Swiss-Prot record:
InterPro entries: MDM33_fungi. It comes from Schizosaccharomyces pombe (strain 972 / ATCC 24843) (Fission yeast). This is Sensitive to high expression protein 9 homolog, mitochondrial. It is found in: Mitochondrion inner membrane. It comes from the Eukaryota. The keyword Membrane applies. The gene is she9. Homooligomer. The chain crosses the membrane at residues 166-186, 295-315. Residues 316-317 are mitochondrial matrix. Residues 187-294 are mitochondrial intermembrane.
Length: 317
């Protein structure tokens, strides 16, 4: 197993440089393509072309200068060669009376070479003139390329600066609009929602407290009502239900629900509708009457307390 692991590690180590070079090459190619695309979008590709033209013109000027230097060197050599030949001819002419056969042959050869030396000097002079004209033209072309590149760079920088200025103003406008929207629309809605939620929460807590108090009061009243009813039942005469007419309907008093405020109001409405109905005859005992009076008293007090409490909450808001 260790041998397989070591072989796998060695294989990965051998493949890692290839993987790295491949990944690095793809990343560099992607960056280069993205850079070229950005230059095309911003118009910088034309400036890159002018830069390349300037570099080519500099290379051309350098080559022409080398050619001109070589032409001047050949011209100087041709002039020196002709001058040397003329000096030797002059020396031979000065001692013409004592020429030998060798001197005569030398003079003849120098006289013939003088024509070719003159032709070489003229040709070298022409080459120098041509090379200097080429150098001058290349130098003028280089100056024009540099000026054109400088002009295009200035135009491009002005465009970028203008676009940057408009972009900055656009971002500032968006920020101002967002600030106005947030401060004038979103924040008031958020505050209203928070206030509404807080008020609803407080109202629910108040309602729960009122319901708890109503339940406690209802329990106490039920206990007191039962005690009062038992006492009145013991001291009051008994009513015979048989003396009532047979066609009369006896009304059984509905109970009042004190669980919640809404249930209390509903049960009170139902009780009043039954109590004020003309189709029923009410038969009450002293106990029921006392309980009823107690419930009405307590119910009225609870209603008054509730309304006062609600008005107090309204004024606090």
């Amino acid at each position: 197993m260790l041998q397989r692991l070591s072989q796998s590690i060695k294989g990965f180590a051998a493949r890692f440089p290839k993987i790295y070079n491949k990944g690095n090459g793809s990343v560099q190619q992607t960056i280069l393509q993205a850079s070229q695309r950005l230059n095309e979008l911003t118009g910088y590709s034309s400036i890159e072309a002018l830069k390349n033209a300037v570099v080519k013109q500099e290379t051309k000027l350098r080559d022409f200068r080398l050619s001109a230097a070589e032409a001047r060197k050949r011209y100087i050599e041709a002039v020196e060669k002709r001058s040397s030949s003329q000096r030797e001819v002059n020396e031979l002419l000065q001692r013409r009376s004592s020429w030998s056969t060798i001197d005569l042959e030398r003079f003849t050869k120098l006289y013939r070479d003088d024509y070719s030396n003159k032709e070489e000097e003229i040709k070298a002079q022409e080459d120098v003139d041509v090379a200097e004209r080429r150098v001058e033209e290349a130098q003028n072309g280089l100056v024009r390329s540099i000026l054109s590149r400088y002009h295009e760079e200035q135009v491009w920088s002005d465009k970028i600066r203008q676009a940057s200025t408009w972009g900055t103003w656009g971002l500032m406008g968006i920020n101002v609009v967002l600030f106005v929207v947030v401060q004038l629309i979103l924040e008031p809605r958020k505050r209203k929602r928070l206030v509404r939620e807080a008020v609803d929460h407080i109202d629910k807590e108040r309602e729960l407290e009122i319901n708890d108090e109503l339940k406690k009061i209802s329990e106490k009243l039920d206990k007191k009502g039962e005690a009062v009813g038992q006492a009145l039942e013991l001291t009051s005469p008994k009513i015979d239900n048989k003396n009532l007419p047979k066609n009369s309907a006896s009304l059984i008093l509905p109970p009042i629900n004190y669980d919640t405020f809404h249930s209390f109001l509903d049960s009170l409405k139902y009780f009043l509708s039954r109590f004020l109905s003309t189709d029923y005859r009410i038969q009450l005992t002293y106990r029921q009457l006392s309980i009823l009076a107690t419930k009405f008293t307590v119910g009225g007090g609870v209603i008054i307390y509730t309304f006062i409490h609600l008005f107090g909450l309204a004024f606090k808001r």
